[in-house]
Amino acid sequence: MSEKSEKIYEAVTNISDELVESAGAKRKRPRRAWYISAVAAVLVVVIAAALFKPGGSALAIAEAAYDGHERLPDDISAPDGCFEALTAQFLSGAGDENAVLSPVNIYMALAMLAELTDGESRAQLLELIGIDSVEALREQAAAIWKAGSGESDECTSLLASSIWLRDDIGYVQDTMDTLADVYYASSYRGRMGTAELDKAIQGWLNEQTRGLLEEQAASIKTDPLTVLLLAATLYYSAQWTSEFNEELNYTDLFHAPSGDVDAEYMYAGKFMDYYSGEGWGAVRLSLRGGHAMWFILPEEGVSADALLEDAEVMRLMSTGEADGGEYAKVYLSVPKFDIVSQLDLIDGLKALGVTDVFDPAVSDFTPMTADSDEIYVSDATHAARVKIDEEGVEAAAFTVLEPGDTAPMPPELEIHFTLDRPFLFSVVTDDGLPLFAGVVNTP
């Protein structure tokens, strides 16, 4: 067992009030009110068994040791096809509702689930992820974890994961070690279906997401048939590199599918690249830390769902890559928004070819435990929240509006880019990892 694994599995204690209040892998980090973008995501996979045996109330607690941020190596490819498939599947059909997800967060949970399975159950997960073997998956997942995690004064992106074990079942130690070593999974053991354990799980989720998803976390509960609960989270915040001036904000109509609503718009005139394709236009706003937020606006008469079937749009949202940008003076109006959604992933994952893990008659969880049969995934819940505003943005050290000897000539093209109808967005790292993607139907 590695040193990291020993740290994660060495402690066994009873549930205490302090644990329930603060269960989780804590990081000492300041709370900064000046972040303009705060987003969080959580995915919970509940694995249940058809058989139940009562047990004690001991809870094993340990905290994962997180390595520092590293760029994605050149020889590691991100699972762009998986990111695109997840984004299209779970953002389509939102109707009048807003929808948001974290492709990276879902990917990490699916990768951990692949470690717990074998046979066709694992093969279906690997096919969706787009990788040939679990060994290659581990290398990819570890690299993505390090590339997607980091904290500085400019940008915070924090991944976390945990496994919650039933106290009357034995688990395969090698598999638990892998979850600790590759996925930095903190481990907990307790009596499933109790209010104490549920409160500890909810407390861990709230700790990792800084309380942004408290209502959604409160809905996560175990029952006596739960064999293992797997949780993966992502918290993110960053500053714009060029601020919006609050004095320029204005209120106007947003043409939502269900009817016009008032929205508060942030406004700026910026020199930037403008991207367009058949039925859409897009702009990229830079975030400190090298990240970016993309806004994709369908043309009049084109729906957001239609763009989710556009290969070029999906590549842009999933990788941050786009062709054919034109340098322009863009008059940009962006509605302030705070959107949250909670998704049941089971039907969508089945549509993407992952079926066996949900069927106790055919699922294969032998890498996890030999103590129970007919094990299956009974619940797969993903919650995410994204909010943006203009507050607290520091003045940029440099800006494209500042004249200089090497600045490009003023563009002839002028674009009025007003997000006053349903639009898509994504938050992408400098490595091309899609941390968040969403559709705003009503800001």
Predicted features by range, described:
Residues 28-51:
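Internal signal-anchor transmembrane helix that establishes type II topology
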Residues 1-29:
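Disordered, charged N-terminal biogenesis/targeting segments of membrane/secreted proteins
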Residues 83, 98-122, 284, 411-443:
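Feature captures eukaryotic membrane-trafficking machinery centered on endolysosomal pathways
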Residues 57-62, 96, 134-301, 322-410:
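Non-catalytic, conformational "gating/processing" segments within enzyme and secreted inhibitor domains
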Residues 89-157:
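Post-signal peptide N-terminal segment of secreted/secretory-pathway proteins
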Residues 64-71, 104-108, 120-127, 178-188, ...:
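Acidic/histidine-rich, surface-exposed loop or edge segments in extracytoplasmic proteins
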Residues 48-66:
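Sec-dependent signal peptide cleavage junction
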Residues 125-129, 244-253, 304-314:
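Short Gly/aromatic-enriched secondary-structure transition segments
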